[in-house]
């Protein structure tokens, strides 16, 4: 049984229009569920690249089933599940449903109620008897009683419009004896590899990562080969994703559950050929320079245009306290050394809502590298305060310089608010980025860029709105937390109460480094151009008014912070920004 929310909502969901100027920073609907008991998570999106006139089109699908809301919402209500296939022909601005795939098998447990863990793969060249452009869709079919887990494949020869069942190719048992999360890629020799999680040898390994190889385009598969198998029986490496880097190495990212800390920290390791993984090597935990670590359901990709690894996951945690961080569920990790050494982080293109406990927001987020160099981020997100997940999507560059903010076109995509913990609203009107009233124990802090940035200049037009206020820009920010001045880094602020331009060092409080009055003072409702350049230990601040040719320049040396993210800040009153540029 499905619970219809409204006929209008269903009609609207058939062709979802995505506004590029969405000002709430929450992404835009890929799927607005018409039924209030729909479970929608684990979305996957692909851009067709071997499809002739269909090149550039996007295809998307996700886990789709119906929860038993009257007895146990974690279980299906008996209605068969499906994979809904949606297509966008305009880069993700609008989506239409192409078809819906059901379980056509018969026998005990079929048709399956759970359609879990889908994955698309487009053939870049002929594999077996199947030509370039052939599509595979694999998923994990699980019945209501979880009596088995089954990887099943469908094939499309018309770029996703129709799908033929290929069949089951791996069989697992019940929960704690099952198979999970298939991921397809090509190894160095061009063979098709499926990586997945395996509990079928639970007496030795509660869960391990394994792979199978196909040399005929997915018709048949070879033996199961372990790729990550811990010596500790209770360790549970899981949810593998793999990407090929431009040094020829393959990098695998995965969670490791079952050990302290209990947040399933993300690990990575590399292979020279995509097939040799040294199974007893558990890999390296992903930790940022400012002491954060990723936890649960990772997804990784290599961005050749910026030569950096990107890694998203369900959550981020403080490595000292194991508490969620201010940027939790809305950050992407970056590594510029092929997975070795330090990681930095950047805001995800948009921020999920976790208002509803019935939705596991940001679980297994998906990233797609677009042909235009931006990253499309797709994730489950709360739909209201009590309902299950919708699926939203949005795209933005991640950690790329130079950066020009186009608020009129992109809204808040690529920005997150960490200072006020949801107590202060940021909004977009035309080309302006605005924050509501702040003061007391909170500040409005919106950040963009990467904590790995070192030498750069941020400039913006800033305006105090109303009678009194303090607004400014920040640089080299790390470890942000909710509250007033709760971060490490530098702040450049204009203050109407003093008429000063002040440069601060922040160490979870603000310490003035240099301050000077501006000719004519700082007036509300007037635009001021401010910039802060950080180069080595030298900090250079510049201020000018839209009604004056006079400039005020402050220069100081400070060696406390060498890298960090950039952003905008409001400490008192209300404010607006425009013409934000980082170079």
Residue spans for each PLM region:
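Secretory/extracellular carbohydrate-interaction modules
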Residues: 437-502
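Extracellular glycan-recognition surfaces and repeat-rich motifs
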Residues: 410-443
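Fungal secretory targeting signals
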Residues: 1-24
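Extracellular carbohydrate-recognition regions
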Residues: 24, 395-421
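Asp-box/BNR beta-propeller blade signature and adjacent active/binding-site loops
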Residues: 23-401
């Amino acid at each position: 049984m499905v619970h219809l929310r409204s006929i209008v909502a269903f009609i609207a969901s058939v062709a979802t229009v995505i506004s590029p100027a969405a000002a709430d920073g929450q992404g835009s609907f890929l799927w607005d569920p018409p039924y209030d008991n729909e479970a929608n998570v684990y979305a996957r999106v692909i851009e067709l690249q071997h499809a002739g006139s269909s090149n550039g089109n996007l295809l998307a699908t996700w886990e789709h089933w119906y929860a038993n809301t009257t007895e146990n919402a974690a279980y299906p209500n008996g209605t068969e599940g499906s994979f809904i296939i949606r297509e966008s022909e305009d880069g993700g601005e609008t989506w239409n449903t192409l078809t819906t795939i059901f379980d056509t098998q018969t026998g005990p447990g079929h048709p399956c109620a759970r359609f879990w863990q889908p994955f698309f793969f487009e053939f870049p060249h002929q594999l077996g008897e199947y030509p370039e452009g052939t599509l595979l869709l694999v998923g994990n079919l699980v019945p209501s009683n979880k009596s088995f887990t089954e990887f099943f494949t469908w094939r499309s020869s018309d770029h996703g419009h129709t799908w033929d069942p290929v069949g089951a190719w791996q069989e697992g048992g019940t929960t704690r004896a099952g198979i999970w999360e298939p991921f397809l890629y090509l190894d160095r020799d061009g063979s098709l590899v499926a990586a997945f999680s395996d509990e079928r040898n639970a007496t030795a390994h509660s869960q391990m990562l394994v792979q199978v190889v196909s040399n005929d385009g997915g018709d048949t598969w070879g033996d199961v080969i372990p790729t990550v198998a811990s010596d500790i029986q209770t360790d549970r490496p899981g949810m593998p994703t793999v990407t090929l880097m431009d040094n020829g190495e393959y990098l695998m990212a995965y969670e490791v559950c079952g050990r302290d800390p209990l947040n399933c920290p993300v690990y990575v390791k590399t292979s020279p050929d995509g097939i040799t993984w040294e199974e007893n090597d558990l890999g390296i935990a992903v930790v940022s320079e400012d002491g954060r670590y990723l936890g649960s359901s990772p997804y990784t990709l290599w961005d050749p245009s910026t030569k950096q690894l990107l890694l998203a996951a369900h959550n981020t945690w403080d490595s000292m306290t194991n508490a969620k961080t201010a940027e939790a569920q809305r950050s992407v990790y970056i590594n510029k050394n092929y997975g070795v050494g330090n990681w930095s982080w950047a805001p995800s293109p948009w921020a999920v809502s976790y208002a509803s406990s019935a939705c596991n927001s940001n679980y297994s987020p998906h990233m797609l590298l677009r042909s235009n160099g931006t990253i499309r981020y797709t994730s489950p997100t709360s739909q209201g305060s009590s309902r299950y997940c919708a699926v939203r999507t949005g795209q933005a560059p991640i950690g790329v310089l130079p950066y020009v903010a186009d608020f009129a076109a992109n809204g808040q995509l690529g920005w997150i608010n960490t200072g006020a913990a949801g107590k202060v609203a940021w909004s977009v009107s035309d080309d302006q980025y605005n924050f509501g009233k702040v003061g007391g124990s909170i500040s409005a802090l919106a950040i963009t860029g990467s904590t790995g940035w070192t030498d750069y200049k941020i400039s913006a037009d800033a305006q105090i709105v109303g009678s009194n206020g303090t607004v400014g820009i920040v640089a080299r920010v790390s470890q942000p937390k909710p509250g007033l001045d709760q971060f490490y880094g530098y702040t450049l602020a204009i203050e109407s109460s003093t008429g000063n331009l002040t440069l601060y060092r922040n160490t979870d409080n603000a310490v003035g480094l240099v301050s000077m009055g501006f000719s004519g003072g700082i007036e509300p409702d007037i635009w001021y151009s401010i910039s802060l350049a950080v180069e080595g230990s030298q900090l250079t601040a510049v201020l000018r008014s839209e009604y004056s040719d006079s400039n005020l320049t402050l220069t100081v040396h400070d060696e406390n912070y060498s890298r960090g993210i950039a952003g905008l800040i409001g400490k008192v009153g209300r404010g607006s920004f425009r013409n934000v540029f980082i170079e």
